[in-house]
Structure formats: C-alpha cells, structure tokens
C-alpha cells in the first residue's frame, strides 16, 4: 500500500490530498488547504513550503503528484502560480518523494473521463471514487483528483517497468 500526496498549487490557497493506493483502488486518508493569506509573496511561498512539508511529515507519503502550470490570461498570476508550485516541489524533493507532474486535462481525463470536465464534475467523481459523504473544499478536491490521477498512472506504468524511467532531479516526467 502506497501513500500518495496530490498538490493543487496556488499562491493564496494550495490544496492537498492524501490517498492510499491499495492496488485495488484508492482510499481517502486526508485533505485540506494551506492558506497563505495576502502578505508579501516571499512569505506566502514560505507558507506553501512549510505547509506541504508539514503534510509530508504528518502523513508520510512516498510519492507526489502536482498539477503543471497552465497559461493564464494574466502573466503575473501564472508566474506566482509557478513559484508556489516550485515551493511545493522543493518540499517534496527535500523529503525524498518521487514527484510526477500532470496537466489539468490529464487529471480531468483520469477522474471524469473527459479532459473538458468542470470543477464540479471532478469534485463529484472524487466523492464517488473515494466514497466521501461530504464535498471536500474545491482546492482539496482538485488535490485529491491529482493524487487519484497519479495512482492511476502509477498502476498503468508499473507493468511496463516505466516507473522512474525518465527521472530528472527526483521528478518523473510523463
């Protein structure tokens, strides 16, 4: 059984989700949000790093999936998102986690069956797949979806011996 951490990065709210991959499916372990407030960017990035590090210490995942940066209309927002993502990746790398990156389309395809699914469709599928009785907060739901996507990709790669085949600096590029 493998514990998987999913991260939905953000400069103000970073969602996290932890699932246990049993080999026959995934079980919910934990989820939540790291709220950084509205202070200086450097302090918000430190809060992302510290928060992700604390989640890793608390739950002990061995691998992490994180969403790739998408091109936003606002270049400044995309840059800040990329920096928050970097802080989360460094926290995972510091802890020795294997890290994989997924596009939003890959996550939606893996969870809802279509890359065009909206956040509510993904949230409902996360609830169904993990047998949750209540809706998780949307950022936590997205992080759980990333963890489930990572579990799905890990299962499809293991029989072919591809896990770790394209590792660079601790990150698995798919």
From Swiss-Prot:
One of its GO terms (molecular function) is DNA binding. Keywords: Cytoplasm, DNA damage, DNA recombination, DNA repair, DNA-binding, Endonuclease, Hydrolase, Magnesium, Metal-binding, Nuclease. GO terms for cellular component: cytoplasm; Holliday junction resolvase complex. The keyword DNA damage applies. Its cofactor is Mg(2+). HAMAP family: RuvC. Binds 2 Mg(2+) ion per subunit. The active site is at 8, 67, 139. Its EC number is 3.1.21.10. The RuvA-RuvB-RuvC complex processes Holliday junction (HJ) DNA during genetic recombination and DNA repair. Endonuclease that resolves HJ intermediates. Cleaves cruciform DNA by making single-stranded nicks across the HJ at symmetrical positions within the homologous arms, yielding a 5'-phosphate and a 3'-hydroxyl group; requires a central core of homology in the junction. The consensus cleavage sequence is 5'-(A/T)TT(C/G)-3'. Cleavage occurs on the 3'-side of the TT dinucleotide at the point of strand exchange. This is Crossover junction endodeoxyribonuclease RuvC. GO terms for biological process: DNA recombination; DNA repair. Homodimer which binds Holliday junction (HJ) DNA. The HJ becomes 2-fold symmetrical on binding to RuvC with unstacked arms; it has a different conformation from HJ DNA in complex with RuvA. In the full resolvosome a probable DNA-RuvA(4)-RuvB(12)-RuvC(2) complex forms which resolves the HJ.
């Amino acid at each position: 059984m493998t514990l998987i951490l999913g991260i939905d990065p953000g400069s103000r709210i970073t969602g996290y989700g932890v699932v246990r991959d049993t080999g026959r499916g995934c079980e919910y372990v934990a989820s939540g949000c790291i709220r950084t407030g509205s202070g200086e960017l450097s302090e918000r990035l430190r809060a992302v790093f510290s928060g992700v590090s604390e989640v890793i210490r608390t739950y002990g995942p061995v691998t992490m999936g994180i969403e790739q940066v998408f091109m936003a209309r606002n270049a400044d927002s995309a840059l800040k998102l990329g920096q928050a993502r970097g802080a989360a990746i460094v926290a995972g790398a510091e802890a020795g986690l294997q890290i994989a990156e997924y596009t939003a389309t890959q996550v939606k395809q893996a969870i809802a069956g279509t890359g065009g699914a909206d956040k509510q469709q993904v949230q409902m599928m996360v609830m169904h797949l993990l047998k949750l009785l209540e809706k998780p907060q949307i950022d936590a739901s997205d992080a759980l979806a990333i963890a489930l996507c990572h579990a799905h990709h890990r299962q499809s790669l293991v029989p072919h011996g591809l896990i770790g085949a394209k590792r660079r600096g601790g990150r698995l590029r798919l």
